[in-house]
UniProtKB/Swiss-Prot annotation:
Any matching Pfam family: DUF150_C
Gene giving rise to this polypeptide: rimP
Function: Required for maturation of 30S ribosomal subunits.
CDD domains named among the record's database cross-references: YlxS_C
Biological process per Gene Ontology, one example term: ribosomal small subunit assembly
InterPro entries: Ribosome_maturation_RimP, RimP_C, RimP_C_sf, RimP_N, RimP_N_sf
Name assigned to this protein: Ribosome maturation factor RimP
Taxonomy of the source species: Bacteria, Pseudomonadati, Campylobacterota, Epsilonproteobacteria, Campylobacterales
Originating organism: Campylobacter jejuni subsp. doylei (strain ATCC BAA-1458 / RM4099 / 269.97)
Amino acid sequence: MNLEALCKEAELSFYDDELVSENGKKIYRIYVQKEGGVNLDDCARLSEILSPIFDVEPPVNGEYFLEVSSPGLERKLSKIEHFAKSIGELVKITTNEKEKIEAKIIAVDDENITLENLENKEKTTINFNDIKKARTFMEW
């Protein structure tokens, strides 16, 4: 099953998916984006496309709930493409060496992310493979 193509059919772009357990229930979440933002009708349209397909070809074993939503303003960055689409945004990164970084994404290439330190404006480049986890954040 090609989630990216199915999202495109609903005029959305696939961002990510995850399987989580909350209160003993399995939830299969699909995150989507589109220019101008995702609304409830967009999520419902994709859910209507996916439900009959998932009835025949379930994405996970056993009983589960399907959720379709936008990844949100503060979202996980797990692919190099996520960083590329987040240029200009603030990010919290934990490296494989457990170093914590808060910076602004200023450039992305095939395997490196260039960041600007929020305090001293110093620029640094980090290899994507050196990142354990990353998430955008907003300063309120």
